[in-house]
Structures are given as C-alpha cells and as structure tokens.
C-alpha cells in the first residue's frame, strides 16, 4: 500500500473490471431468478422491472469492487473517490448550468421535429408502470444509476487519470468518452450529447473536487429525462 493512486492503465483496467463485473453479476442473477432463455434476453432492454433490478444489482457490485480497489492503495475510499460535500455556491451554480445544458438539446430536437424521448425510455417506463415497478424505476434512474456511474467515471477513473492541473482536460475527456460509450443503447446523436454533458460534469468535478456534486448533477439530468418520458407517455 503506497497511498498513491492506481496508474492510468491499471485504473482503466480495474474500472472496466468493476463495470463489467457488476453487469455480469446482474445478468447472471436475473437469468437465475427469472430463468431467462437466450430467446428472452432482449427483455433486459425493454422490461422496466428487469432494467430496474439490473441497475440496483450492478451498482451495488460495482461500487463494492471500486471500494476494495481503492483500499488497496492505502487511501480511504471516500477520499480516493472524491466523496466530499460540495460548497453550496458550487451546487446552485452548477445545477442551474446543467439544467439548461440538459434541456437545450431536447428543445432543439423538438424544434426540428425529433422526439428526445427514445423508444428505450418509453418501453421501460411503460412496462414498469404496467408491472407496478414505476417508483423503483424512478429511484433507479434518478438516484441509484447516477451514484454508480459517477463513482466509477468521475470518481475512480478521474482520480487515476488526473495527476496534475496540466492533465485535467485529459482526465475530463477520457472519462467523458468512456461514459458516452457506456450508453450504447442510444443513437449517435444522443451518445454525442452524453459526451458533451460528460465534459461538463468532469469540469465541475475538477473545479469542486467533489464527486457528490456530479452525482447530484447527474441526478438532475436523469430527472429531466424521466419527466420528459412521463409527459410523452401521458400524451401517447
């Protein structure tokens, strides 16, 4: 134990292990619980209940792995992952900026005749509502998911890649790119939007030193998306 962060290559490798480890355990658990056959694996992409459960399970496993990995450096997990409370001024200002940044592309999409609510969002919302899992889906999307993703991308990965103020934008860009690639269920336009928002979240992480701040901001973005889905569903 050296009290030094993992190297960049090790950080990337360990981060991927945590990410896919969590997803793998979630998949195996759901297959075991529900006896999903190969023919029904696609249900994991459209069934709101299964998506909700997978978020809970994957986040729990991924976070546990990240904590274990950080402890191997001899540094406390909270310190390593940037889990510090943000300043009130930073929270208010960044929340305002992120709210505008999240709403502007969706408004532009509607202006040009595109629906910002994807079929994936609509399908999981509809099925979760039908199965009585809607409150748990809201919690998964607005709270649990952002906590897991930010702990990985703006927490663990950012710490491993950010070594000095000079390489801040390298860390910000790398984490934003990886975060965007993790949203492969969306089209290229939305993935690009995720990347830009990732740059913004990374900047706030760098300036504030707080991953809790980016968790809250990520939650705001996902809340906007869920509200848009709610409106679209009730208009359908």
Model-derived features: positions:
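Structural signal for membrane-spanning alpha-helices in multi-pass inner-membrane proteins
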Residues: 66-70, 105-109, 141, 179, ...
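Juxtamembrane helix-loop-helix connectors linking adjacent transmembrane helices
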Residues: 34-53, 75-145, 163, 233-236
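Membrane-interfacial alpha-helical segments at the cytosolic side of multi-pass membrane proteins
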Residues: 154-165, 227-232
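Functionally important transmembrane alpha-helices
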Residues: 22-31, 169-184, 188-236
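Hydrophobic core segments of transmembrane alpha-helices in multi-pass, intramembrane catalytic enzymes
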Residues: 58-62, 140, 193-201
């Amino acid at each position: 134990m050296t009290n030094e962060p993992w190297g960049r290559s090790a950080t990337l490798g360990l981060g991927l292990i945590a990410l896919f480890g969590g997803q793998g355990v979630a998949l195996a658990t759901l297959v075991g619980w529900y006896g999903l056959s190969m023919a029904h694996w696609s249900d994991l992409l459209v069934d709101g209940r299964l998506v909700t459960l997978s978020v809970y399970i994957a986040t729990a496993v991924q976070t546990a792995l990240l904590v274990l990995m950080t402890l191997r450096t001899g540094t406390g997990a909270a310190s390593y992952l940037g889990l510090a409370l943000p300043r009130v001024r930073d929270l208010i200002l960044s929340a305002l900026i992120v709210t505008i940044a999240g709403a502007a592309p969706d408004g532009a999409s509607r202006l040009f005749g595109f629906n910002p609510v994807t079929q994936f969002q609509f399908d999981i919302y509809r099925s979760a509502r039908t199965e009585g899992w809607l409150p748990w889906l809201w919690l998964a999307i607005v709270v649990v998911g952002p906590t897991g993703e930010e702990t990985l991308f703006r927490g663990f990965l950012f710490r491993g890649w950010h070594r000095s103020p000079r390489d801040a934008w390298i860390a910000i860009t790398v984490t934003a790119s990886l975060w965007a690639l993790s949203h492969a269920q969306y089209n290229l336009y939305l993935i690009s939007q995720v990347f830009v928002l990732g740059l913004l979240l990374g900047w706030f992480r760098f300036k504030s030193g707080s991953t809790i701040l980016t968790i809250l901001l990520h939650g705001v973005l996902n809340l906007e998306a869920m509200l848009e889905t709610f409106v679209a569903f009730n208009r359908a």
